[in-house]
């Protein structure tokens, strides 16, 4: 289960409950949000779907505890294209 709680307009606390529970702090810059979503979904939805993307590739305990959403592409080059498809 993925729970996304806004801390402020660009920062979110994400709690992932799986075999173990992890907490993550994620920052989403307005420009990256707009690039990925064209404002079709809320930042919370983008973060939640991004965690679904990550969990298909690694365990929640392997996900960085604090990161900017744009960093995902450094580890998974297919992220931007895939997340845009997931948000259609």
Spans of features found by a protein language model:
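A short, polar/proline- and glycine-enriched secondary-structure boundary/capping micro-motif
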Residues: 24-25, 37
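Acidic, low-complexity intrinsically disordered segments
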Residues: 40-87
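Short, surface-exposed linear segments at secondary-structure transitions and domain or protein termini
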Residues: 31-40
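Beta-strand/loop nucleic-acid-binding surfaces
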Residues: 25-31
């Amino acid at each position: 289960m993925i729970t996304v709680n806004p801390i402020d307009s660009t920062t979110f606390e994400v709690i992932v409950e799986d075999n173990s529970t992890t907490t993550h702090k994620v920052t989403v810059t307005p420009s990256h949000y707009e690039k990925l979503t064209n404002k079709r979904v809320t930042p919370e939805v983008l973060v939640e779907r991004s965690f679904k993307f990550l969990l298909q590739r690694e365990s929640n305990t392997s996900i960085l505890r604090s990161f900017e959403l744009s960093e995902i592409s450094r580890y998974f080059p297919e992220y931007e294209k895939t997340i845009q498809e997931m948000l259609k």
